[in-house]
């Protein structure tokens, strides 16, 4: 009888141990995920009187020939990896010389050896460029491609300000880099509003100091 009881107790202990291990494994799985081959990145930056945000996948070179092979020349590319790249403008902007209303767009590129056509498309919720429809294009601009001095291993999109109201959308990967100039669609109006806001803030600051 004692042997039976001990056996039962041992069985219960093993069962409890198995449950504890399962719970711990589940908790670990909830906190961690499998490393992504092409990590997703979100970039948000102040631009003029609002913000610009970009959501994109970052594939690596990994010893491959990129432009002209992995990314064929003359074909629409998702400008990243996995789901299409999304760019959101908080205000109407001048995108490489063309007006784009505030909103979210899919960002695509048609690369050639010497220049890239950078496209903003209404459909920003597709996988890759498999369902890309040129009829949904909002604007496209063609910009020159520059050769980098050092290889860019991971695909990267950045926003580089040139002053408080203008900047460049910089896209680079492997040995190639292209830039699209950005500014508010109504720069004169934005500057006037900005100057007026600065005047108001100065008056408020002076008033606070006097009191």
Model-derived regions: residue spans:
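Bacterial Sec-dependent N-terminal signal peptides
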Residues: 1-32, 207
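Targeting-peptide/extracellular-domain and disordered-appendage signature
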Residues: 30-101, 106-211
């Amino acid at each position: 009888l004692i042997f039976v009881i001990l056996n039962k107790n041992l069985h219960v202990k093993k069962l409890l141990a198995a449950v504890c291990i399962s719970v711990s494994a589940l908790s670990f799985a909830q906190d961690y995920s499998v490393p992504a081959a092409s990590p997703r990145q979100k970039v948000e930056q102040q631009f003029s009187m609002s913000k610009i945000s970009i959501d994109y996948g970052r594939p690596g070179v990994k010893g491959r020939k990129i432009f002209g092979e992995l990314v064929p020349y003359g074909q629409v590319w998702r400008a990243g990896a996995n789901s299409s790249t999304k760019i959101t403008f908080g205000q109407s902007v001048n995108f490489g010389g063309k007006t784009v209303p505030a909103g979210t767009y899919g960002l695509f590129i048609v690369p050639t050896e010497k220049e890239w056509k950078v496209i903003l498309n209404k459909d920003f919720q597709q996988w890759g460029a498999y369902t890309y429809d040129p009829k949904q294009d909002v604007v496209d601009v063609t910009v020159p491609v520059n050769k980098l001095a050092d290889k860019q291993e991971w695909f990267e999109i950045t926003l580089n300000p040139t002053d408080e109201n203008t900047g460049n959308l910089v896209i680079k990967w492997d040995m190639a880099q292209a830039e699209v100039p950005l500014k508010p669609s109504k720069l004169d109006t934005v500057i006037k509003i900005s100057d007026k806001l600065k005047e108001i803030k100065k008056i408020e600051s002076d008033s606070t100091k006097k009191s």
